Structures are given as structure tokens and as C-alpha cells.
């Protein structure tokens, strides 16, 4: 699909202070309502890794059949790393590579899962929210660790969950996706409701801690082996 990274940081002077200000402004554009088809055809998962001692950002994209959760396409995009890691500003470091990976997909996904925060973020604008606002695609953030808010530890069974609260408002879910594993931090990014983010993540879980879209993207981004593609994709 076609996309452009040119307008992503238009007007940003490169400073941390202005990046945080832009997050606060762009967070006003986030839509926390379900705008995903009841029967989507395609899902996508995205994750980022680094090469050359951090000098190159490596973004992985996996397109999946929404019904079978089998992978249809995998792509990797590489761009020079333009910013050091700053907590809470992950999208300013990784978004250009993610958008480059999105552009490699032959078809547009109906829903995107990103390894990172949605609105479960100090300024309610993590990388999944930023990605969604920039692309217009429904998005969900699935993170391995909490960045903001507090929660009561969910029960120990698969599917147990509890709300994550920040200043009295819910910003996400702590989800026990697999027994004896730490909970995932799940939150809507854009064009998905709070409940929708939880429901879609549960629908895409299999035998692993991570939902299939980000599990496969994580495997590709970290170069932990090849991904076998579905040889006869479902007719769309």
C-alpha cells in the first residue's frame, strides 16, 4: 500500500520538549470508538528491532488472514536511526521505519496491532496511537511492560484482566494472556474502543503470550527464524 513518512513530524524541531507538546496536540485526534468491520479480512502486526549497534532501525510487518490468523506476507524495512531512546517518545524513534514497512504491504489491513503502547501512555499517545492517527488505520497497542498508570494484578488464568487507571481514567488493560506469565498491557491506539482493544487481543491469542500479529512481527523483527506463509490465502 502507498503511504508517506514526509508529514509525520512536520514542524518538529527535534527537541524532546516539542515532541511531548506534539503528542499532547495529536492525542486530541485519537478516536476511541469501534470502527473495525465485524468481519475484517486482514490484520497486520508490527514490531521494531535494531541493527548495526542501533544505527539502523529495522521494522517488521506481517499481514495475516483475519479468520485463520495465518501469515500471508512478511516485510522488513530499514531506515537510519534518527533519535536516541527517550522513554515516552518511542514513536519519534520508530515510526518512520514502521511506516516504511506498512508501505511494503500489498493490501491495506483492516486492523493493526503494534508492539508498544496505545493510549496507555503518560500523554495518552503511545506509538500505536501515533501510528493510527498518522495512517488513519484502526490500531491497538500490545506492550510487554507498563509505561503509565496503575492496576490490580489480574487473576492467573488466561483471559483474566483488570483496568489500568491514570488520574482516575482508564487507559488500558492488564491482560493475563498465558498462565504463569506477566500480564500484557493492552490499549486502544485509534479507531478502536477500550473494550474493543481487549476483545480483539483475546480473539487473536493462541498458545503464546503474545497475540499472533505481534508475536509473528516480534519474531521477524528480532530475527528469530523464518515465518512460513500461508500458501493458498483465503479468498477475499
Swiss-Prot record:
Catalytic function, reaction form: Endonucleolytic cleavage at apurinic or apyrimidinic sites to products with a 5'-phosphate
The enzyme's main class, written as a single word, is hydrolase
Task: Give the GO molecular function terms.
Answer: deoxyribonuclease V activity; magnesium ion binding; RNA endonuclease activity, producing 5'-phosphomonoesters; single-stranded RNA binding
Gene it is expressed from: nfi
UniProt xrefs under Gene3D superfamilies: archaeoglobus fulgidus dsm 4304 superfamily
Q: Where is the signal peptide?
A: none
* Official protein name in the record: Endonuclease V
Q: Which cofactor does it need?
A: Mg(2+)
The entry's cellular-component GO terms read: cytoplasm
- Give me the residues that bind Mg(2+), please: 47, 115
Keyword Phosphoprotein in the entry? The reply is no
Q: What does this protein do?
A: DNA repair enzyme involved in the repair of deaminated bases. Selectively cleaves double-stranded DNA at the second phosphodiester bond 3' to a deoxyinosine leaving behind the intact lesion on the nicked DNA.
User: By its UniProt entry, which PANTHER family does this protein fall under?
Assistant: ENDONUCLEASE V
Could you tell me which Pfam families the record lists for this protein? Endonuclease_5
- Assigned EC number: 3.1.21.7
What HAMAP family does this protein map onto?
Answer: Endonuclease_5
